[in-house]
């Protein structure tokens, strides 16, 4: 499945706009608290284990969105947006959304 942040796919014609699709993943409070309170594993100015957790959450949200698009008969998603939000009790939510299309 093609997934892009752009409104179209170069060299491809969008045959049908199907629906808005999304996916979410929430990281536990202890991870978020540790993320902002401690950087014990910082290497070269980056916190590797936290980046790994954020990537994992983003991948889960993206997979959820792609599965929803597939269920709706789409073979691509355009206009994808990724948001990170701190929600109640210090939990972090990764939310992705886009438009499911058929090319």
Curated annotation (Swiss-Prot):
InterPro entries: UPF0145_dom_sf, UPF0145_YbjQ-like. Belongs to the UPF0145 family. This is UPF0145 protein BC_1012.
């Amino acid at each position: 499945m093609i997934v892009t942040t752009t409104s179209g796919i170069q060299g491809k014609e969008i045959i049908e706009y199907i629906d808005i699709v999304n996916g979410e993943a929430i990281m536990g409070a202890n991870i978020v608290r540790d993320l902002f309170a401690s950087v014990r594993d910082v290497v070269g100015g980056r916190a590797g284990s936290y980046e790994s957790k954020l990537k994992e959450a983003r991948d889960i949200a993206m997979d959820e969105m792609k599965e929803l698009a597939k269920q709706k008969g789409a073979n691509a998603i355009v206009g994808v947006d990724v948001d990170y939000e701190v929600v109640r009790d210090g939990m972090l939510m990764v939310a992705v959304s886009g438009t499911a299309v058929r090319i």
